[in-house]
Amino acid sequence: MISEENFQQHTPMMQQYLKLKAENPDILLFYRMGDFYELFYDDAKKAAALLDISLTKRGQSAGQPIPMAGMPYHAVEGYLAKLVQLGESVAICEQIGDPSTSKGPVERQIVRIVTPGTVSDEALLPERQDNLIAAVYQEKEKFGLATLDMTSGRFQLCEPADKETLRAELQRIVPVELLYCEEFNEMAAIEHCKGLRRRPIWEFELSTAITLLNRQFGTKDLRAFGVEKSPLGLSAAGCLLQYAKETQRTALPHIQSISLIQNQDCIQLDAATRRNLELTQNLSGGTENTLASVLDKCVTPMGSRLLKRWIHQPIRDVEKLKQRQQAIAEILNFDLVDELQPYLQLVGDMERILARVALRSARPRDLTRLRTALEQIPALRTIVQQKTSPFLTALFSQIADFSEQWDLLQRALIETPPLLIRDGGVIAEGYHAELDEWRMLSDGATQYLENLEKRERESTGIDTLKIGFNAVHGYYIQISQGQAHKAPIHYVRRQTLKNAERYIIPELKEYEDKVLKSKGAALALEKQLYDELFDLLLPHLGSLQLASLALSELDVLVNLAECADTLNYVMPTFCDEVSVKIENGRHPVVEQVLKDPFIANPVELNHNRHLLIITGPNMGGKSTYMRQTALITLLAYIGSFVPADSARIGPIDRIFTRIGASDDLASGRSTFMVEMTEMANILHQATEQSLVLIDEIGRGTSTYDGLSLAWACAEWLAKKIRSLTLFATHYFELTALPEQLEGIANIHLDALEHNNSIAFMHAVQDGAASKSYGLAVAALAGVPQSVIKLAKQKLTQLEKNSSYSAEQQIQALREANHNQGELLFEQETDALREAIEKLDPDDLSPKQALAYLYQLKKMVG
């Protein structure tokens, strides 16, 4: 920015600025000057453009005008919020020296760095979603990933086995900042993330990470946290902790532990599945009409955030799920929703308030909200313990007795304090005797000045005489110009106005010094007492955090009970058999947005019926049917009740979806390539305990290619993997699969045509659909009737002239599959050679030979 040789040409103030800017060259520097934060040079130009503030000049330095922009210090939070939302980071530089005693520029220091992932101020945070920062480390083909929520202290790590798993984890946590090593070589896996920050390799050094983590937690080793055998995750965690300390410039006592996320403990959802199921974000990027938008009526922001974490990370611990179900049932049975929610609402965002207490950045109203939260605990405890069985009572065993902390805050703080401690008026009367004495001296000024004014009027005979005060000249005696000649000789003129003269007398000056001293002493003491409140609260931080987590969970359970009651959900049951059986299931989101009654449908998947071929018209409800099956399963595995008449669900390890696709222009991938990539991931990762949803595979290529791929994928899933699969297709030929393989069945969603119109029945029935209704759907979409008429003529002609009928295509695929000797499932490396060796051209018709040639061609390229 500024060359070294020109540095000495700058003013002392600008030299100080340039030194501080050099410490953080890549981020904006807010430089405190009196009552303003100012930015200079390129920072000023950038801030002016981003914040829509004026770009001006501040004199000259080194012979050049200095570009400058700024904002009042009291308005800085709004500007910071906008910059953070834009993904910018800001270094906050404050005056820490005393201007009255400083020689040269006042001493300044960067006191904190505000970044999107490390903010804790209420105004800068999205209230009902987590604000996470993450770090990723790579060693060969394996990864370490660590996440930190600065607003709660939640610190976690995991070790994704491959880049697909890494991508899925990043899709789950959606970090606002992602730190990555300078030697990271899988940028395609992280390039979609916000706030990418490249960090030096030494920040990921394992031994340094272990030392830093032990120092943070006050431990000798990390075995108590169960992370000691996760070196890649620890390397990422070490970088993350260094970054947090670097930006906060203070201790981080609310980060008290770290935990390992075990994939086997949760149902795995890949990135495509999270997107397709629209859990917390719809396909357009918004939050309307998502699962979370239907379920989330939590009365606390921290409960809302916890619910979204549950949705994105369903657990497989059936005993824990049953405990959640039991708690929801108890809340319903005792009609506790209306009784508990008013108290929970007053608890507020206790979790984030505690983080600000830990960082010593909590404002007076944070502490009064904490006081209010603590005040609700006894009433909540009484309700829960008197009316419910052991699970909710056990939840409250995590909540200690905070009567002493409540009493402290009750005595220390006034009822409704100002926003900031800066101007005082926060500490309550009676809390500290010395503070009360200084305040009495200061507050007694009004009576003293009234008495002095009355006395001086009487002694001088000047009826226009009055005593006033301003910040520049202090106290003064003011006399109108018409009576100024009557001023006594001991009145010393202080200021001349157009219509009056202002004077000072020794007695008033002496009193002014005394009052100003008392105000200054009172403010300094009040700030000291406010800081001491943090010292008194911090020893209890760990137990307070446990309480906030328990109250968050209670809020979620009460919320799910309310949903079950108002939305007519039922408690699902779990079984040991790998299966899903749902009676009259409903899509939890679609049923809320439909004006007409939702048509409920059953689904049954088990060992003998593990793949359902679903046919029917477009818009008939195939995708809705598949999605509702996945969402009902997911809801069961967060412990919620589900939208159905009944549900019985066995062990599920993963949920996969291949529903819909569009071009991935950023990565240069076509619709078909995106489709095949998602399908390949399913074929590699799915197991017998996976729930797989496949919708219209193979439509992005030619008919024969698409049919062959769809057939092969369905056969692989049914015969090799044996996962629980819903397989929707527009290839009617696939309805012959149940005749060939065990465990496959046909179902369809029907429609009725009448007088060139179509009515979708949305009801699932056994068997294959009789037709596709494609032309009827096209007419419904508004395609001109002349085009529909021409299409009907072409359809009749094609059906009449087709020499390669659907039956023949199916037979060719069957025979080709047989003659290949189960080529699809062959594990040998030289599969192509073996396939050709087994081929007997004399046994093939010309049509069969052509189909076989297509398959051989695909094998080589």
Swiss-Prot record:
Keyword tags: ATP-binding, DNA damage, DNA repair, DNA-binding, Nucleotide-binding
Gene Ontology MF, one: damaged DNA binding
Pfam family of the protein (one): MutS_IV
A cellular component annotation (GO) from this entry: cytosol
Positions with a binding annotation for ATP: 616-623
Alphabetized NCBIfam families for the sequence: mutS1, PRK05399.1
The keyword Endoplasmic reticulum is annotated on this UniProt entry: no
SUPFAM superfamilies, sorted: DNA repair protein MutS, domain I, DNA repair protein MutS, domain II, DNA repair protein MutS, domain III, P-loop containing nucleoside triphosphate hydrolases
Function: This protein is involved in the repair of mismatches in DNA. It is possible that it carries out the mismatch recognition step. This protein has a weak ATPase activity.
Protein name, UniProt field: DNA mismatch repair protein MutS
Family: Belongs to the DNA mismatch repair MutS family.
Keyword DNA damage among record annotations: yes
GO biological process: mismatch repair
Organism: Haemophilus influenzae (strain 86-028NP)
